[in-house]
Amino acid sequence: MATARLGVMRPPRSCALIFLCAFSMATAPTNATAHRRAGTVKSTPPPEDKGNYTAKYYDKNIYFNIYEGRNSTPRRRTLWEIISKFSTSEMLSLKRVKAFVPVDDNPTTTLEDIADILNYAVCDDNSCGCTIETQARIMFGDIIICVPLSADNKGVRNFKDRIMPKGLSQILSSSLGLHLSLLYGAFGSNYNSLAYMRRLKPLTAMTAIAFCPMTTKLELRQNYKVKETLCELIVSIEILKIRNNGGQTMKTLTSFAIVRKDNDGQDWETCTRFAPVNIEDILRYKRAANDTCCRHRDVQHGRRTLESSNSWTQTQYFEPWQDIVDVYVPINDTHCPNDSYVVFETLQGFEWCSRLNKNETKNYLSSVLGFRNALFETEELMETIAMRLASQILSMVGQQGTTIRDIDPAIVSALWHSLPENLTTTNIKYDIASPTHMAPALCTIFVQTGTSKERFRNAGLLMVNNIFTVQGRYTTQNMFERKEYVYKHLGQALCQDGEILFQNEGQKFCRPLTDNRTIVYTMQDQVQKPLSVTWMDFNLVISDYGRDVINNLTKSAMLARKNGPRYLQMENGPRYLQMETFISDLFRHECYQDNYYVLDKKLQMFYPTTHSNELLFIPRKLRCPHLGRNLRFPHLGRNLRFPHVGIGSY
């Protein structure tokens, strides 16, 4: 049995602020350290460590020498005793951090439960208390444990097994989901753009990155049939880990190849054609959110209810691309016939009925409901790939108890049809405040994702290139000390000499004067509601274009309603706000500052069930010239090259 011996080292004198997300940052440890070095011992009960404080590994428990507080004499503790201590004391003091870890009065905690509040750092010198570079520092409250990443023991394997799949799946699925959401105008942003990124736990993600090898590859192959056509789906993923100043970067290239294997590969796109679904079936598949529908317009129920006669043209009541939180067909309701109406419910509490046979309703259903399902399925796809990758890294392929569904070719096919022929990129950054009880620190997360397609005689290749970086915003000075933000005790960000972008139940999101692209996410001392908006609306941060479109079209609709049908016939008069026009105009992106050329991006697909997809809009072949083959990401200082792809070559 492989075992190890822990050495003793007194805690250093200095104690410095630890930036949670900075992996290479020189910091001093807090009041507790533990160290280990390789060795072997017999599997016997632990002896009393009188003068020689030695902690050991055994079959079930790992013992550590722990310095607690200012006591110079270490105490022997098992890992589970450490976690238990963290559960009973530290977690109770962290009760306000509800967005990161659920806490009750009698917490029972496992490694998986506390994974999201780890402070994890790879050491490049002795400043963090660990002796060699191959050791990693893991913090449980005020206790530091040094773990050799290459150690082949049950404790480290168990920790990797819990953290790595979770972190990698969050990175891949969240990044691609964010890319698709932004590509299609942040449609449904309440769930699927920046709010969609709430599922990403940066500390867990970076812990998983640290456990990954510097380079790794995985290839999966799966045969399937579409109408007696023999097809193959080939999924390949490559990971490259890069250390940068103050942080860590992981680059991933995921490739999907759809290949026709019979008939010499002719008409390979047959392998991408799956049966469409019916929007009414989707609505009936999901149970109603409540037992009522379309309350009578004259009855007060504590929140405003729009009349069923209201058309989608009256957008002054809501922002439809972000506010729809539930759509369903009423069941057993006398106000709305089951087979002809659908109920819409918004974040603000509006709800109303609309006829299913109206074009505006169908378009809206396809956009909002379909897009939400599309991102959900895409997220599961990338999670599946990440889990397979993590299993390979851990050398536990086929591990008993691990359930991973097969990669669905229908989802990959829908991605192929929906993404533009050109190379598309998103380059996003946002800030996250320290989620622990320590002094507040600020880290910046960069997510850069690009997609490209290439056609072959017998196959199609879809490539997703992702760069994920977390680094300290300021390596020498806390951002809050620069007075760009003022940090309140409960974790709320208050603006100082900056613009308040959004305020929700006492929580403010600020744009500092020095950076108009920053989004700050801070904890708040309240129980989070399921429909609570905790992220700033993305359209307000990136550009005002989407809001301008809505405002102009809303004015046009109101003038048209006021002046009658003849107003619509005016050559330069505002148009009536039809949903087709609304969707088309909303998904426009400027390529040039002079507005000469626009690239029309429309929602083109969704796949609400596992084995089906449907094209909602037929894409136009619009190209943005002079983009070149390389894209420069300023924060990484290098070019991202998509192989085999030339813009405008189709």
From Swiss-Prot:
<comment type="subunit">
    <text>Associates with the gp82-gp105 complex.</text>
</comment>
<dbReference type="GO" id="GO:0019031">
    <property type="term" value="C:viral envelope"/>
</dbReference>
<feature type="glycosylation site" description="N-linked (GlcNAc...) asparagine; by host">
    <location>
        <position position="516"/>
    </location>
</feature>
<feature type="glycosylation site" description="N-linked (GlcNAc...) asparagine; by host">
    <location>
        <position position="290"/>
    </location>
</feature>
<keyword id="KW-1133">Transmembrane helix</keyword>
<feature type="transmembrane region" description="Helical; Signal-anchor for type II membrane protein">
    <location>
        <begin position="1"/>
        <end position="32"/>
    </location>
</feature>
<feature type="glycosylation site" description="N-linked (GlcNAc...) asparagine; by host">
    <location>
        <position position="332"/>
    </location>
</feature>
<feature type="glycosylation site" description="N-linked (GlcNAc...) asparagine; by host">
    <location>
        <position position="338"/>
    </location>
</feature>
<keyword id="KW-0735">Signal-anchor</keyword>
<feature type="glycosylation site" description="N-linked (GlcNAc...) asparagine; by host">
    <location>
        <position position="422"/>
    </location>
</feature>
<keyword id="KW-0325">Glycoprotein</keyword>
<feature type="glycosylation site" description="N-linked (GlcNAc...) asparagine; by host">
    <location>
        <position position="52"/>
    </location>
</feature>
<feature type="glycosylation site" description="N-linked (GlcNAc...) asparagine; by host">
    <location>
        <position position="552"/>
    </location>
</feature>
<keyword id="KW-0261">Viral envelope protein</keyword>
<keyword id="KW-0812">Transmembrane</keyword>
<dbReference type="GO" id="GO:0055036">
    <property type="term" value="C:virion membrane"/>
</dbReference>
<keyword id="KW-0946">Virion</keyword>
<dbReference type="GO" id="GO:0016020">
    <property type="term" value="C:membrane"/>
</dbReference>
<protein>
    <recommendedName>
        <fullName>Glycoprotein 105</fullName>
    </recommendedName>
</protein>
<feature type="glycosylation site" description="N-linked (GlcNAc...) asparagine; by host">
    <location>
        <position position="359"/>
    </location>
</feature>
<feature type="topological domain" description="Virion surface">
    <location>
        <begin position="33"/>
        <end position="650"/>
    </location>
</feature>
<keyword id="KW-0472">Membrane</keyword>
